[in-house]
């Protein structure tokens, strides 16, 4: 029987099991199955996935993120805010501004602190990727951004493809509460045009500074929030002329609000909370 200490944290209800790999050990070949086991709501702790906080050669810390199906993702906005909180409060970093390595690249985090506890974290997510190769997405044609139609259930849905280190398909609807989240979501997620699968967002524009947001995450399904998805949604809204560069946009997710801005300089900034749920020790056994 193996075990490790964990901290369960969430960003707007998007919860992960966080493991401090400066202190704990999990075999590389076991990571996918451990992520699946620990995320199981019935036989594990229950979460949207597992995130490892690891040593890095290029930053104070490195984040590795696994979905609850065991697949490894390249980035996670809500996860980054929680990693920033954990790293600061456990003195893995120096100062309130620091970098975090991800599989999608290095990002900069800035934390707001009250009584030695992080209450908010702002992440510079870098510039969005908009080409088919960067997303990645199969097909022909290279326009300034990809906007395509997808026929589902005799209805044509237009989506805008954006990568924030992971792929997103953003669909604008009149009412997110009646959007085909659990039907179109998994169909588009696993469509062959997306070789690495895709996260699917449904967006309802409220005004030039607010939007409602619902998400079907690849590898996890419906979640309360998706930080990279909120970033992709704001980018897509600006690309489609629905919002403006430089403004801070309030994104209303099922789990709460994020503040997102696509700056004139080209980077996307995300600001929001990160909270601890519980701590403990998880025991597991890998069948031979």
Swiss-Prot record:
It holds the Pfam family DAP_epimerase. Transmembrane segments: none annotated. The record marks 168, 217 as: Could be important to modulate the pK values of the two catalytic cysteine residues. Pathway: Amino-acid biosynthesis; L-lysine biosynthesis via DAP pathway; DL-2,6-diaminopimelate from LL-2,6-diaminopimelate: step 1/1. It catalyses: (2S,6S)-2,6-diaminopimelate = meso-2,6-diaminopimelate. The active site is at residues 76, 226. The keyword DNA-binding does not apply. Its main location: cytoplasm. Homodimer. Belongs to the diaminopimelate epimerase family. NCBIfam families: DapF (TIGR00652). This is Diaminopimelate epimerase. It comes from Bacillus mycoides (strain KBAB4).
